[in-house]
Amino acid sequence: MKRISILLLAATSFAVPACSSDVSTSGDDTGSGSGSGSGSGSGSGSQTEWDQVLGSRVTDYSAALRVASLRLNGTLPSMTEINQVASATGDAQRIAYEALVRDYLSRPAFANQMMVFWRDTFKMGGKITVGATTVDLDTAPAFAAKLTVDNGSYMDLFTKATGNCPTFNAGAGTFTDAECANAGPKAGVLTNPGVMAQFFSNFAFRRVRWVQETFDCLRFPAELGTTPTDVGGAAPYLGVWPFNSIASPTNGGGRVNFQDVSSAICANCHQTLNHIAPLFAYYDGTGAYKTGVISVPTPLDKAPPAQLSDYLPPTETTAWRYGKAAADIPALGMQIAADPDIARCAVARVWNFALGKEDIVDQLVDVPKETTAKQLEAFTQNGFKMKDLIFAAFTSDAFVKF
């Protein structure tokens, strides 16, 4: 539903100018997302030619070993390791290579590499000072890195109720469990105080955007249907939620007009944003949860705090997606974990890490579904184990062939 085709995207690019820069131009997931295409514009980049190029690659475990060692341990392989692979022949070379990859995944250096990976992925790390409070921005990356090193379930990122703020000893490459001390509900990184502080903003929209882009690999608008709705603007509304499901001064008494159609159709993005953001609105600028007190500002004069009526009319409830209600953040985490696109995004991010690609959202480096179908199936059927997924990526044909 939300992964629209490039034709629909082109047809609607002028319909949603406020959100158009947030739509991936990678289209129907069959391209790299780089926007450069494969040919000169004269038809030179045919599928047959790509097949020929891909078919001409040869397996080179020695070259793969160098890349794997750098990615997974941050250093080049030792001469002993190089010779283990180089001196083997036939299938023994594959076995030697895979054994070394497993060894790399067991070393303390791998934990350090995962801290770097998750800091980059989460766009956070170190510490910040908010007023008189120092907030640790490393506990969310440490939680994800520990989960990866322990070969835990990726879905614990959204559902785990304890031990969500571990510390990391870089010298030893070890983690120590710790509880988050910001009160409120507990649901993996979704309730992490560092996340809440790092992405504090008007209406808590930056927090929602972080969740959306990090774990769904897609910019807003996130839910686009195929049937445009005339809402009296210069362009139609393309969302799947009813247009009146979000607030405005004339629909539920909201103080901001999220139903504005004078230029952009704001509801294309806010249909989803407004159903999630209230759940994150109770965390203040330090990431502390304030029970019953909305603690994020609005862009209105004198920055008054947001109100529930600003987001939704009284008949609406919070939700992850249309038809996927979530009354609180733990329920939101369960809905996120059950969304197939979340697993696909995880596989795509690991794939891009292995292949040395840039961020899937920031640089539009999408991964075609067909490319990672085998890894996604194994990931889903094997309990979403992160270390197993990384091993699968680093031993795939795409990684070992050059």
Cite the ranges covered by each PLM segment.
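Sec-dependent bacterial lipoprotein signal peptides
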Residues: M1-A18
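Extended surface/linker regions that mediate inter-domain or inter-protein docking
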Residues: I95-I276, A337, D341, W351, ...
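Flexible, low-complexity segments enriched for small/polar residues
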Residues: R66-N73, E81-A86, R102, R119-K123, ...
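N-terminal alpha-helical segment
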Residues: Y61, S78, Y97, P368-T372
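Surface-exposed intrinsically disordered loops and tails
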Residues: W50-S56, D91, F168-D177, G225-N257, ...
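Alpha-helical oligomerization/assembly modules used to build nucleoprotein complexes
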Residues: S87-Y97
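Ser/Thr-rich, Pro/Gly/Ala-heavy low-complexity intrinsically disordered linkers and tails
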Residues: V16-L54
